[in-house]
Amino acid sequence: MASKGGRDKIKLESTAGTGHFYTTTKNKKTMPEKMAITRFDPKARKHVQYKEMKLK
């Protein structure tokens, strides 16, 4: 049986308004604040800021 672990699945959603998103995991103990990272948005065809949203 697997242990519970300290990583949560999160959704990184584009701030360009295209609706594109990435899914990833983050360690909730070492990084309790919301994550914001610059990634490539293929719909906007440029690098934009992605912000953490709740994964439904």
Swiss-Prot record:
Q: Which GO terms describe its cellular component?
A: cytosolic large ribosomal subunit
| Any single GO BP term | translation
Record keywords: Ribonucleoprotein, Ribosomal protein
**Does the keyword Transport feature in the UniProt annotation?**
no
**Matching Gene3D superfamilies, A to Z?**
Ribosomal protein L33
Bias class Basic and acidic residues marks the residues at 1-12
Q: Where is the composition biased (Polar residues)?
A: 15-25
Does the record's keyword annotation contain Membrane?
A: no
Q: What GO annotations for molecular function exist for this entry?
A: structural constituent of ribosome
According to the UniProt record, where is the region Disordered? 1-29
Cysteines joined through disulfide linkages: none
This protein's source sits in the domain of life called: Bacteria
What family does the database annotate? Belongs to the bacterial ribosomal protein bL33 family.
Name of the protein in its database record? Large ribosomal subunit protein bL33
From which source organism is this entry?
Verminephrobacter eiseniae (strain EF01-2)
Q: What is the lineage of its organism?
A: Bacteria, Pseudomonadati, Pseudomonadota, Betaproteobacteria, Burkholderiales
Gene (name only): rpmG
